[in-house]
Amino acid sequence: MSEQDARSVTGIRDKDYNLIWFVEASLSNALRLEGYISDADMDGDAELADFFRRAQAVSRKGGDLGKAMLAARLKKEE
């Protein structure tokens, strides 16, 4: 949803909406990948488990970077 769309629905422009969404999506993806890793491990598929672990690390990094950026932006507003 674009800022214009969100504004027309809620009447409020949220400049941080996309960043908050990104953090939530990244960390949710990292959590979801935990199940995929477990499944691959149980199936004895080390290659797939390793692939999911690498993808999970990237998702966590994105979440961490997004959290840091959001914290810095919110602190500026104080």
Describe the predicted segments one by one.
Residues M1-E78:
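Iron-associated oxidoreductase/ferritin-like identity signal
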